[in-house]
Design a protein with these regions (language model features):
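Short cationic amphipathic helices and targeting signals
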Residues: 89-97
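Long, contiguous binding/interaction regions
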Residues: 1-69, 73-75, 84, 101-179
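Short, charge-patterned binding micro-sites
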Residues: 79-87
Length: 179
């Protein structure tokens, strides 16, 4: 039996930039309204395809882990939003807790969970904006291929996008095939 999967069209750079602007506007609205830190979750999805069953399942794991983190720490969640978009899934939480501690826990989750490297958990503070990893003494994200700083490899296009996509897909497939 053959199962045909529709081929998804890639997302244009203009669409990605517009989605990023809309996300920043939502974040700013929440920061103004709640005056509390906001957690923004997106996925690391190299290539043109940003919405697939693989990525949706990965986002599902990320959502579960983030909700568990908030629950375990008994942090008050003032609002939560989840969007399934052609440009990739996005989630926001507004949390009544100090931003630096939230970021420290989010960075640990990104570093310790087998899929965490594919999650981009940003923490934005109403007073000081984005809380960076470096401000907490955390290391920069590493490249999925060569372990150099990810930003440098991404900007220089050091690795073929097909190689990076294959690595991401393998990480996801390995996670869901475990046990």
């Amino acid at each position: 039996m053959t199962i045909a999967t529709p081929v998804r069209a890639g997302v244009s750079l203009d669409a990605l930039l517009a989605a990023k602007e809309r996300r920043a506007a939502r974040q700013a609205d929440w920061l103004t309204h709640y005056q509390q830190p906001v957690i923004s979750l997106t996925l690391v999805t190299p290539g043109e395809i940003k919405d697939s069953l693989r990525y949706r399942n990965t986002m599902g794991v990320a959502l579960q882990m983030c909700d568990q983190l908030l629950w375990e720490n008994r942090w008050q969640v003032l609002d939560r939003q989840l969007l399934w978009l052609p440009t990739g899934p996005e989630a926001l939480w507004c949390v009544a807790h100090p931003a630096a501690e939230i970021k420290a826990h989010c960075a640990e989750l990104e570093q310790t969970h087998p899929l965490g490297r594919l999650w981009d958990l940003d923490v934005i503070c109403p007073e000081n904006g984005h809380v960076g990893r470096q401000s907490l003494g955390s290391h920069l994200r590493r490249c999925l291929i060569c372990d150099e700083p990810a930003h440098a490899c991404s900007r220089s296009r050091k690795h073929p996008v097909e190689q990076v996509v294959a690595r991401v897909e393998k990480m996801i497939d390995d996670w869901f095939a475990r046990d």
